[in-house]
Regions:
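Generic enzyme active-site microenvironment
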Residues: 48, 89, 126-127, 238, ...
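Surface-exposed beta-strand-to-loop junctions
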Residues: 49, 85-92, 165-173, 275-278
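Extended active-site neighborhood of metal-dependent phosphoesterases/phosphodiesterases
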Residues: 27-37, 97-234, 250, 254-264, ...
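Active-site-proximal beta-strand elements of phosphoester/diester hydrolases
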Residues: 42-57, 165-179, 235-245, 307, ...
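Loop/turn elements at helix/coil->beta-strand transitions in domains of secreted/extracellular proteins
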Residues: 20-24, 41-44, 82-85, 118-123, ...
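Binuclear metal-dependent phosphoesterase catalytic core
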Residues: 4-32, 157, 250, 258-288, ...
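Active-site environment of divalent metal-dependent phosphoester hydrolases
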Residues: 53-55, 94-96, 127-136, 176-179, ...
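N-terminal active-site segment of His-dependent metallophosphoesterases
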Residues: 2-105, 110
Length: 388
């Protein structure tokens, strides 16, 4: 029987593998990794998005390779950043709108398995468009069946909670993209109720009437009542779809962001018959990837958020709206969308200061190449043992 050329070689290979796995799973964060110890009273949240898990539909490659690697990435990221809670900003499922209730539960169990020993951390999950579907398939019953398995969400897919004296609010932003449906009206009612709640908690202490349309026409009516809340005195707002980002054109008119000519939306929220080119195509692209301008204005006016966290754009951005409200868009934490996966770490200080670090993970081809090289070296070492 062939022997190893050196008794130390297997140990060297194992040590090299462990060092490689530790390197690939360590996130690279802007400004360096957040300090492991927080000041008294501070809160740190790990913001992830667009995991796009398949649950019971996962392939063997997903179950025995991607889930294993993703679990290592989560474990190392949590050990490095030491968050107090985890927030998923939508699209935890790749095709949740096609799932029945048992398949939806399988997705949640898959995520729990990926978190492993850290599945006991406080967790809040926001619903995204891949979870509930586009406007043509948005169904209140489906949203209710999903939301009842997600602590903190009501039947419309919205939620409000407090953690470490910090108020959070999550909205079913997908419903706000779709006019004329009951789910949208329910989300608007949640907005009015929470706005009333935060006004009552405000420094003025006056009992204000709920915000919203005087005639019940909803967000689009633009007839909200005066809000006495100061900027940033509202909750930390959690969304999947980002807010509309206006910018000045050459004529000085506020309009939608412009994209290169020929941009065509292939987003599931947009029907294929509506895919256009040129200016109309660019507007359609923006409308399918951000909330409408009127909904954005209403949310900012009604809630006066402390800060907004959103996703869906697959990339990181830190944007300040014209009224001074800060919105941070979190990158996708999956290889399925291409590019480099990542997440954000938000640290909430007691004096109202929020610091955000964007952390990036390795691309999938690094992992595939690394494991391939390790297998090649192992095979070469075994082959070498036969030659000696």
């Amino acid at each position: 029987m062939a022997a190893w050329p050196s008794p130390w070689l297997p140990l060297v290979l194992v040590a090299a593998l462990l060092a490689f796995e530790d390197w690939l799973s360590t996130p690279s964060c802007s400004g360096g990794s957040p300090a492991p110890d927080l000041a008294a009273g501070d809160l740190r949240a790990m913001m992830v998005a667009d995991l796009m898990l398949l649950g019971s539909d996962a392939t063997y490659a997903d179950r025995f390779f991607r889930d294993h690697v993703t679990s290592k990435l989560f474990t190392k990221s949590i050990e490095t950043t030491n968050p107090d809670m985890i927030i998923v900003l939508g699209d935890i499922s790749a095709r949740g709108s096609e799932h029945n209730e048992s398949k939806w539960i399988a997705v949640l169990e898959q995520f729990e398995g990926i978190l492993g020993q850290y599945s006991s951390l406080p967790l809040h999950i926001v619903l995204g468009d891949k979870d509930v579907g586009g406007c043509s398939s948005l169904d209140g019953k489906l949203v209710h069946h999903m939301a009842k398995h997600l602590p903190g969400l009501d039947s419309s897919g919205c939620g409000a909670f407090e953690f470490s004296n910090i108020s959070f609010m999550s909205l079913n932003a997908v419903a706000l993209l779709c006019g004329g449906n009951t789910l949208r009206f329910n989300v608007e009612k949640v907005l009015e109720r929470e706005s009333h709640h935060f006004q009552k908690k405000g420094l003025n202490g006056a009992d204000h009437s709920p915000l919203g349309s005087e005639n019940g026409e909803g967000v689009g009516a633009h007839s909200w009542r005066q809000n006495s809340m100061t900027l940033g005195s509202g909750p930390v707002l959690l969304l999947h779809i980002p807010l509309h980002k206006s910018q000045k054109s050459d004529t000085g008119v506020i309009g939608v962001p412009m994209f290169p000519d020929g941009t065509v939306s292939d987003h599931p929220l947009v029907p294929p018959s509506s895919k256009l080119r040129g200016v109309d195509g660019r507007r359609l692209y923006d409308q399918s990837h951000t909330l409408p301008a009127n909904s954005t204005q209403y949310i900012l006016q009604a809630l006066k958020p402390r800060i907004i966290f959103s996703a869906h754009a697959d990339s990181f951005s830190d944007h300040t709206h014209p009224d001074g409200t800060r919105e941070v868009t979190v990158p996708a934490m999956t290889w399925k969308k291409g590019g480099m996966p990542g997440f954000a770490i938000a640290t909430f200080g007691q004096k109202g200061v929020v610091s955000v670090n964007c952390c990036w993970l390795v691309q999938e081809w690094y992992i595939m190449t690394g494991y391939s090289v390790f297998l090649f070296l192992t095979a070469l070492a075994i082959r070498w043992s036969h030659w000696i």
